[in-house]
Amino acid sequence: MRTCYTGQVCRDHLGQTVTLYGWVNRRRDHGGVIFIDLRDRTGLAQIVFDPDNAEAFGTAERLRNEFCISITGLVRLRPEGTANAELASGEVEVLCQQVEILNASVTPPFQLDDDNLSETTRLTHRVLDLRRPQMQHNLMLRYRVSIEVRKYLDQLGFIDIETPMLTKSTPEGARDYLVPSRVNAGYFFALPQSPQLFKQMLMVSGFDRYYQITKCFRDEDLRADRQPEFTQIDCETSFLNEVEIREIFEGMIRHVFKVVQDVDLPTPFPIMSWTEAMQRYGSDKPDLRVNLEFTDMTDVMRDVDFKVFASAATTAGSRVVALRVQGGGEMSRSEIDAYTQFVGIYGAKGLAYIKVNDVAKGREGLQSPIVKNLHDAALAELVKRTGAQNGDIIFFGADRAKVVNDAIGALRVKIGHSEFGKKAGLFSGGWKPLWVVDFPMFEYDEEENRYTAAHHPFTSPKDGHEDFLESDPGKAVAKAYDMVLNGWEIGGGSVRIHREEVQSKVFRALKIDAEEAREKFGFLLDALQYGAPPHGGIAFGLDRIITMMAGAESIRDVIAFPKTQRAQCLLTGAPSEVDEKQLRELHIRLRNVEVK
């Protein structure tokens, strides 16, 4: 029976006989003495095989990388000068008395310490990839975070309740993953995009504090921070307002960071309205580590001769912003061209700029092809508003507000994170949390000529905004809030609608008529009529949180068996074809299938 894990062997075990299990990480033959590094999920221990123990030594000669073995031996100090300070077990070694090969291994397709493996190779051989210390660290970190979340919520009276994985498809949100019903021919379940409706009905049922750590599913195009199946810390409460809800879950995140990583997050988290975030940063999830902000110049540029600025400044739904970069006047033409190409990804047609050489000289101290098209009053106001100093550069965005926000917002982050930005003090590092509140309830879809829910259609309007649901939905502000950390949205929630008549108004604003609302959400509308309490909640993306805490490059590095950006599992070959018999049982016939 194992006495301890390999990474736990230390001076405390000196003179003791231990039994260890694990995998051969490396084998070395030094002058007749064989050494192996034995590895398990806790770390390494050095095992010594002396030729005086002929049986154990003979077995050791057959060992190769990734053999699974057990050893029993005596813990002793390593010889003087051979200690390894990088290992927890680095002061000691185990003199093997007995060794058993539990299972041999074929030659692995790669060395576990190879840092240049392609992601395809790693995901295809995920079983071996997960043996790598960094991956084991990531999954242990994930486990520890989950444990601390549960401890925190349990202490506050939250109840872990499971909700269905097979549920009803609804028209709002991302594409559903559909599951055909064999018993009910022609009908389909959907895998849940979130437990949203079930947790609201749990509130109606009287379970006033609910949570679960659960899988959710969305059939959408993947990005670096997205997976078709992802894990959510899902929470809901009754009888609390949005401020009280934020306090509870801010406390949860602070607790997790302190206990797991010994990081003290600020108290309290700053709060910013959605409108302010978009005005200052062009993003509803601003990275506050970057010390750069927009300066709105729309009102100043209405009468300038530069048509790009004047047109944007006088067109509804457009804006002109300036981004002052301290010390950026030293940027080369090639660097500016690279940034111009970068903002083009976000729809910007160009990137105007002005270099500030000498503020005291006014127009003559400013360097740019566009200076001649801006009158003196506009230039003076630009310098005043931005606080520009000698040696700065000012970039501009002038277009539809969405293009400006996306392009210059991304430029802000790119410059801040660049080598230049860090040297110039434009990036402060650390952890910068933020609550973004007061989101619009609706976004207008030009193609469909209707409003869509900015979060989801069950979010409550702010007090005094209920009348806008019928008169002017675009003005309605929601009791919604997102928790943002270092430019990532790690959690989002809202106070929910708990009155049936208000929910029906929201459906009408979304052009969901009474018949469709009854068909899709009748169970919710009915539940709200039985004394539904005021309630609200939040959901956190566990995968995102772990990615940040681990400093991982991809969300796939913190999930045991992730999908690729084509939503495939390279380990198992999923998704895969199924045989005709299975399809017939499900009453499904395939047609016009394009093989990719």
From Swiss-Prot:
Database matches in InterPro entries: Aa-tRNA-synt_II (IPR004364), aa-tRNA-synth_II (IPR006195), aa-tRNA-synth_II/BPL/LPL (IPR045864), Asp-tRNA-ligase_1 (IPR004524), Asp-tRNA-ligase_1_N (IPR047089), Asp/Asn-tRNA-synth_IIb (IPR002312), AspRS_core (IPR047090), GAD-like_sf (IPR004115)
Residues that bind ATP: R218, D219, E220, Q227, E489, G541, L542, D543, R544
EC number(s) reported in the record: 6.1.1.23
Domain of life, source organism: Bacteria
Catalytic activity: tRNA(Asx) + L-aspartate + ATP = L-aspartyl-tRNA(Asx) + AMP + diphosphate
Residues annotated for L-aspartate binding in this entry: E172, R218, H455, R496
Keyword annotations: Aminoacyl-tRNA synthetase, ATP-binding, Cytoplasm, Ligase, Nucleotide-binding, Protein biosynthesis
Description of how the protein assembles with itself and partners: Homodimer.
Name of the protein in its database record: Aspartate--tRNA(Asp/Asn) ligase
